[in-house]
Amino acid sequence: MATVNTDATDKDISKFKVTFTLVVSGIECITGILGSGFITAIYGAEWARGKTLPTGDRIMLMLSFSRLSLQIWMMLENIFSLLFRIVYNQNSVYILFKVITVFLNHSNLWFAAWLKVFYCLRIANFNHPLFFLMKRKIIVLMPWLLRLSVLVSLSFSFPLSRDVFNVYVNSSIPIPSSNSTEKKYFSETNMVNLVFFYNMGIFVPLIMFILAATLLILSLKRHTLHMGSNATGSRDPSMKAHIGAIKATSYFLILYIFNAIALFLSMSNIFDTYSSWNILCKIIMAAYPAGHSVQLILGNPGLRRAWKRFQHQVPLYLKGQTL
């Protein structure tokens, strides 16, 4: 069995590193929580009023809610892993944090992938019968596909609770030139199982993203050739929609690839708990959901207008409270 072992003692704690990690990742998480919470509140309020949400808005609600959960969970894990080490390094608590983190990451990726597939089918233009069939059926199938995505994410994250992570503590490590002892925390990771379940959980949605981006690029190329030398080509709404969707997909893929690498390295325990590389992984992991939540708001005209109204109303509300 291929395993990776790391250890850390109480002396490894650096107050500067702990403070720096908590502040930077905390700012990122709070930014993401505000963004995801805003999206959830907008679409959740419409759903609570009994309105039937369009398919795209329904996916956005699921994505923003799962992302809100992920960011809150990441903040909790950072606090526990850095400030409450005794509790965090209990085997059951450690495994619980890792499994739920992977589950929420996989769910987020699936929901984001379905969102891109949905907009690809709306924007791209092909004459193939299969494309027309998918375009007609996607609205009916989407609720079931979202539920299936949750089950698939669970099926590739729950096995991580068995025979992958193991944490134990030795409280009797002697300190040289001293009669006292110190605690030493040992983490063991089964790399074979981690690589299999982690990669299988992200493989299909990443392929969906790449296919959606490829179809959008091909559709844009066909549309550009069709427009020819039309002087209004650069202002054509279809071309703008294509370019906007391609930019959004590219932005997400860049963010997610960095996040996937950072999450895997963090899960594998390759780096020491308080090493600079491990801190960098935590910061990258917090940046991905925050960055994509901001991009979703900026890239959606309805959410952009709602955010501007929110910014205008908050000072008025605060002013009224002080009177």
Curated annotation (Swiss-Prot):
The chain crosses the membrane at residues 15-35, 59-79, 101-121, 141-162, 191-211, 248-268, 277-297. GO terms for cellular component: membrane; plasma membrane. The keyword Membrane applies. Keywords: G-protein coupled receptor, Glycoprotein, Membrane, Receptor, Sensory transduction, Taste, Transducer, Transmembrane, Transmembrane helix. Pfam families: TAS2R. InterPro entries: TAS2R (IPR007960). Residues 36-58, 122-140, 212-247, 298-323 are cytoplasmic. GO terms for biological process: detection of chemical stimulus involved in sensory perception of bitter taste. It is found in: Membrane. Glycans are attached at N170, N179. Residues 1-14, 80-100, 163-190, 269-276 are extracellular. Its main location: membrane. It is a multi-pass membrane protein. One of its GO terms (molecular function) is G protein-coupled receptor activity. Belongs to the G-protein coupled receptor T2R family. Several bitter taste receptors are expressed in a single taste receptor cell. Gustducin-coupled receptor implicated in the perception of bitter compounds in the oral cavity and the gastrointestinal tract. Signals through PLCB2 and the calcium-regulated cation channel TRPM5. This is Taste receptor type 2 member 40. It comes from Pan troglodytes (Chimpanzee).
